[in-house]
């Protein structure tokens, strides 16, 4: 059974890196102390893989996990196949997915997660769990072979969702961007995840975690609000 924790971002309000996620992760990984976590660092454009690995290790030290970045393997895929848990960090979703294709990780991750290996990711790491990355917020844009992602959660995800416009901002709001996406892709569902929220996926059900509701948009911007602590079939 699929077991995934998809988190909107690495911070919430003024919290330090990944601090607000620790209670979720402690429960999610309660049976995995001392186990090996394969960490995918490809989204970290402004830091090296070594630096990203160290940052995550330090942030999650209290969970007592063995975190190993996939770049430590002769073949990056080897680390995935040896892992007890898979984690994908945030950053640039285009760079992340491009390198996942280059290192042939998508099928390996899908197979592991579909057979029950826990998966957690934040920001870009949540985005790639969805059907495609076409509702990412990111620049720079690089070109993966396809925008199709892991499709472990078979809908679109928009992390870091913020409603409305800042005063003086004359560009499109996030709602307007998603409306445009749904005009072009009317059969899609988009799960808009505000800061401080997460989806815990267990099999074919999802539970909303965090401080705010998650918004599900469909054709013509029809809204289905997924309330905090609610569980729904997706």
From Swiss-Prot:
InterPro entries: Class_I_gatase-like (IPR029062), Peptidase_S51 (IPR005320), Peptidase_S51_dipeptidase-E (IPR023172). GO terms for molecular function: dipeptidase activity; serine-type peptidase activity. Its EC number is 3.4.13.21. It is an enzyme of class 3 (hydrolase). It holds the Pfam family Peptidase_S51. It is found in: Cytoplasm. GO terms for cellular component: cytoplasm. CDD domains: GAT1_Peptidase_E. The active site is at residues 123, 138, 160. It comes from the Bacteria. One of its GO terms (biological process) is proteolysis. It catalyses: Dipeptidase E catalyzes the hydrolysis of dipeptides Asp-|-Xaa. It does not act on peptides with N-terminal Glu, Asn or Gln, nor does it cleave isoaspartyl peptides. Belongs to the peptidase S51 family. HAMAP family: Peptidase_E (MF_00510). Hydrolyzes dipeptides containing N-terminal aspartate residues. May play a role in allowing the cell to use peptide aspartate to spare carbon otherwise required for the synthesis of the aspartate family of amino acids. PANTHER family: ALPHA-ASPARTYL DIPEPTIDASE (PTHR20842:SF0), PROTEASE S51 ALPHA-ASPARTYL DIPEPTIDASE (PTHR20842). This is Peptidase E. It comes from Actinobacillus pleuropneumoniae serotype 5b (strain L20). The gene is pepE.
